[in-house]
């Protein structure tokens, strides 16, 4: 292998490593603020390309009461920043936000 090939290979390796380091340092967090006048009973999020919501992220014991907030780390192994979110209220109504770039937007006020 000649010197040019070695330098090119090292450059490619450095770019690959720096790209994965950037993905790991992205902030996938979002603060969900309940401004609905009622309680959020279930909260779901998924990568934008997913066809289903997955599991309730609040679990069995937790809710988000009116005027309360909850932080969620939305990194779930998918490096894309695009997430869909759904909040289901105790009344059965739901609110959705689709195609949110959670690496840039870090708050959702649910109304």
What positions do the PLM features span?
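Extracellular beta-sheet/turn segments enriched in Thr/Pro/Gly and aliphatic residues
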Residues: 93-111
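Intrinsically disordered, low-complexity Pro/Gly/Ser/Thr-rich segments with frequent PxxP/GP/PP motifs
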Residues: 53-77
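Bacterial N-terminal signal peptides
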Residues: 9-16
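A short, solvent-exposed beta-strand micro-motif common in secreted/extracellular proteins
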Residues: 80-89
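Sec/Tat signal peptide C-region and signal peptidase I cleavage site
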Residues: 19-23
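Bacterial N-terminal signal peptides that target proteins for export
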Residues: 1-8
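Short acidic/proline- and small/hydrophobic-mixed sequence motifs that coincide with surface turns
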Residues: 38-42
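Asparagine-centered strand-capping/turn motif at beta-strand->loop junctions
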Residues: 30-37
